[in-house]
Amino acid sequence: CDGVCLTLITLKNKIMEFYLSNETIKRSKFRFLKINEQINLELPLKYGQKISGHICQGHVDTIGKIKDIKKIDKSYLFDFEIPLKERKNIIEKASICINGISLTISKVTKKGFQIWVIPHTFKLTNLSKINKGSLVNVEIDILSKYVKNFFNEKK
């Protein structure tokens, strides 16, 4: 659900029920979710299935805020702000997961990062429903974190 690994508890009359731990509530945007707000739903990847994008675990690191959205030609440039402690793991051209969508960081900025979104992705996800100031779930690429951690321990 919007990039967060959750287990469906019940599904009845198009109403889904999930249990959210305190950690999930703390790290994700779910505590700010509004009634009827559109979220992305992803089925879990089964062993042996093709990966289309990068490895998104559903382990959200932080909440990001959309600072700006610009439509340039047919694509969209999103500018995100994230907390300072998470910025150290942001690497240009690395993968990042926004609301469960595998994307590529096009530029690291002073307060966060930018991504480009193609029309197909924009149309099929909730990125088309959010605006400047909206909050998003951010999962930083696990490989970036592993490499950074490895080199920090070598020091």
Residues of each region from the PLM?
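Conserved loop->alpha-helix
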Residues: 1-155
